[in-house]
């Protein structure tokens, strides 16, 4: 082979899809990065709420900090990731305000009243949560 001949590399990027095996090792970093992207300018830390660390069955708390590093607990979220049949579902709820609507994200977003479970309108500040739920679901559902 000549020194000037181009060398071609073939990468199988499918190996790097967020499969359960890959995500198990860094689920908290994945969730925090997605939250940082979808809920700017806030920064997020992720804490497990239970012992489960499987990407398809866990409860997490997102702790929010403002850009200056000051904690902002009013924006903290609880995220539940769970499998129902073959589908991956997420629920997102404000951690410190149990009266606010919660978001269920399966194949589409549904906002619900926490007391009754009845559908309701998306809150004014709900769009970033929908974006976060879509992004997380896309990252965690393996490609066919």
Question: What is the meaning of each model-derived region?
Answer:
Residues 77-105:
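Short, conserved beta-strand/beta-arch hydrophobic-aromatic motifs that form part
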Residues 2-78:
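Negatively charged, low-complexity tracts enriched in Asp/Glu with abundant Ser/Thr
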Residues 40, 44-48, 91, 114, ...:
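Generic marker of "main functional regions" within proteins
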Residues 107-144:
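Ampiphathic alpha-helical segments that act as solvent-exposed interaction surfaces
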Residues 67-71, 86, 99, 111:
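Generic "edge-of-domain/loop-turn" microfeature
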């Amino acid at each position: 082979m000549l020194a000037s001949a181009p060398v071609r590399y073939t990468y199988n990027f499918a190996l790097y899809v967020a499969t359960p095996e890959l995500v198990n090792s860094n689920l908290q970093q994945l969730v925090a990065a997605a939250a940082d992207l979808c809920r700017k300018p806030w920064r997020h830390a992720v804490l497990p709420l239970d012992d489960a660390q499987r990407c398809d069955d866990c409860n997490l708390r997102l702790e929010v900090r403002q850009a200056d590093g000051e904690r902002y607990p009013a924006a903290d979220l609880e995220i539940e990731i769970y499998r129902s049949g073959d589908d991956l579902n997420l629920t997102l709820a404000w951690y410190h305000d149990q009266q606010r609507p919660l978001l269920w994200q399966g194949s589409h977003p549904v906002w619900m009243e926490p007391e009754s479970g009845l559908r309701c309108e998306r809150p004014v500040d709900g769009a970033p949560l929908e974006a976060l739920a879509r992004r997380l679901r896309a990252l965690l559902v393996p490609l066919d």
